[in-house]
Regions:
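Ubiquitin system architectures
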Residues: 1-76
Length: 76
């Protein structure tokens, strides 16, 4: 499963599952408006590149394309 992540700060991330780039950009812009500080610290990466992240209170089987997920970093 591919998740595109947007980093809000060092602990909270929003992930969007398996989206075409144009739709992802649209949702990304909405998150930018909600979190102005994102503009300067935007960090996009995939699940495989950041294995320290996991889903917060979500069952992977229930995630649909386009869902926006709140993420957090696991303690090492």
């Amino acid at each position: 499963m591919v998740i595109n992540f947007i980093s809000i700060d060092s602990t909270v991330h929003y992930g969007i599952k398996c989206l075409p780039t144009d739709i992802f950009a649209e949702i990304e812009e909405k998150l930018y408006k909600k979190y102005d500080n994102l503009r300067n610290t935007n960090n996009l990466f995939t699940c495989s590149e950041k294995p320290v992240l996991r889903f917060k209170k979500l069952c992977e089987n229930n995630i649909k394309d386009g869902d926006i997920l709140q993420m957090y970093k696991m303690n090492k």
